[in-house]
Design a protein with these regions (language model features):
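The conserved beta1-alpha1 loop
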Residues: 136-140, 214, 246
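Short substrate-entry loop that stabilizes the transition state in hydrolases
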Residues: 143-148
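Lipolytic serine-hydrolase domain surface
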Residues: 26, 30-110, 121-123, 128-130, ...
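Bacterial N-terminal signal peptides that target proteins for export
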Residues: 2-12
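C-terminal motif of bacterial Sec signal peptides marking the signal peptidase cleavage site
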Residues: 21-24
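Gly/Ala-rich beta-loop-alpha elbow adjacent to hydrolase catalytic centers
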Residues: 213, 217, 221
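Alpha/beta-hydrolase fold active-site loops
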Residues: 133
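Short, low-complexity, Pro/Ser/Thr/Gly-rich segments in the mature regions of secreted, periplasmic
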Residues: 391-425
Length: 425
């Protein structure tokens, strides 16, 4: 395994301090899930279907706690977003006091419990866009119920994704000191997530399901898909794309999980960042085995294995993060949110047989090079590096058009775009 060097105690202490500073809800009031009843003029509204394995909280304004419930509870939750002039893409604006100011803060507009086995199906039918696509979000470690709801509302709003949005929130206590409890809670929630995905994919109103999971939620997601494949012999055909953002996954374990999905598995896209400090700590406390979300996809053995498995990797290392941990770039970066939304709105996967996501990024880089009239490296022109076979072909075609001199300059980058972890099955 690459780079299994022990982290100094001082560095670990620094990571813990940073996580403590960013983890909590220090300045947030308790009870943001209290419904306001109506959305204020000038705001935008995001309607979400929220399924959870959390236990109900005694406080109705909190709604659900970090403890484990006995079943799957489903709610329709509407969230209002402040006017564009009062916010930045990628930000969740928490109220500093209640009642929240809808012109400045995210506000819960309504919360409606959905009873019965088919309640979720009815909600999907009434909220299904023309694309007939569903996007399921699974949050990560150290998230409360409201964290998952507001974060996904922000992603849906900022990406302009043409989807019916579904949140699956599992029993995280929202504390950095409950890492092991949270991990066991993901295992506790596998059956429920598998059932939700199976029902969603079986809904005749749905044509396509994309799953986006973050951090520890990627473990839950891949485990649920693995369980589905073992139970049924395959993953549900409508589940075409799986996006793993900053995956807190042991690379060796992921290789085995991926192989268990079989040949007719979804296409996987992974967001990685070598400067992810949260994953650095996770790696340290997990036996110093590389975490999937922190690998360098341009080096071996990852390059060849990812390429053979047909996995697309977006390396966000050079992209500026929105927090000191660099663990939420996928949602906080306007560039990444836009890339996700543009592909989903077009009714395409993150990459497809005709256009690689890297082509859009590459076009920006190539345009900059042409404008400058000089040889500029793709890696310098854009902070997002894309690694997949289709992207490499697209870059090659563009490079030929730009001439051999440019080809010589960016050739090394082009060679790296095609990374490919697990062996192809």
């Amino acid at each position: 395994m690459i780079g299994k060097r022990r982290a100094p105690r001082a560095a670990l202490t620094g990571l813990l301090v940073a996580m403590m500073a960013l983890s909590g809800c220090g300045g947030r009031p308790v009870g943001v899930m209290q419904a306001a009843g109506t959305a204020a003029p000038g705001t935008s509204k995001v309607d979400l279907l929220v399924a959870t394995t959390r236990a109900a909280d005694d406080n109705p304004a909190v709604l659900f706690s970090g403890e484990r419930g006995t079943g799957l509870a489903v709610n329709a939750v509407d969230v209002s977003i402040p006017p564009e002039a009062n916010r930045k893409v990628g930000q969740v604006q928490w109220p500093s006091r209640l009642p929240a100011d809808p012109l400045r803060d995210f506000v819960t507009v309504s919360v409606d419990p959905l009873e019965g086995e088919r309640a979720g199906e009815t909600w999907l039918k009434s909220h299904m866009p023309k694309s007939r696509r569903v996007l399921v979000f699974v949050h990560g470690f150290n998230n409360r119920y409201e964290d998952a709801v507001y974060r996904f509302a922000q992603i849906v709003h900022d990406s302009h994704a043409d989807v019916a949005p579904v949140v699956f929130t599992w029993p995280s206590r929202g504390s950095i000191f409950d890492y092991n409890y949270d991990k066991e809670s993901t295992n506790y929630s596998r059956d429920a997530l598998e059932e939700l995905l199976t029902r969603t994919a079986a809904n005749p109103a749905v044509s396509d399901v994309t799953i986006m999971a973050h951090s520890m939620g990627t473990w839950l997601t891949v485990e649920a898909l693995r369980q589905m494949a073992i139970r049924n012999g395959h993953v549900a055909p409508k589940i075409n794309n799986v996006i793993l953002a900053s995956p807190d996954l042991d690379v060796d374990v992921f290789g085995r999980q991926f192989a268990s999905l079989g040949k007719d598995r979804p296409h996987f896209t992974i967001f990685v960042s070598q400067d992810d400090r949260a994953l650095a700590l996770s790696r340290r406390i997990s036996g110093n085995v590389d975490r999937l979300g922190q690998i360098d996809p341009s080096v071996e053995p990852y390059r060849s294995k990812l390429e053979a498995a047909g996995i697309t990797v977006l390396d966000l290392t050079k992209l500026k993060g929105g927090d000191r941990l660099n663990h939420g770039k996928f949602a906080e970066s306007p560039e990444v949110v836009k890339l996700i939304g543009d592909r989903l709105i077009a009714g395409q996967a993150i990459t497809d047989s005709n256009v690689g996501l890297g082509e859009a990024v590459g076009a920006v880089a190539m345009g900059a090079a042409q404008t400058a009239g000089s040889a500029v490296s793709v890696a310098v022109s854009t902070p997002i590096a894309i690694f997949d076979q289709r992207t490499r072909r697209n870059y090659d075609a563009q490079l030929k058009r730009l001439g051999q001199s440019m080809n010589n300059t960016v050739g090394s980058v082009g060679d790296s775009v095609g990374a490919g972890l697990p062996e192809s099955q």
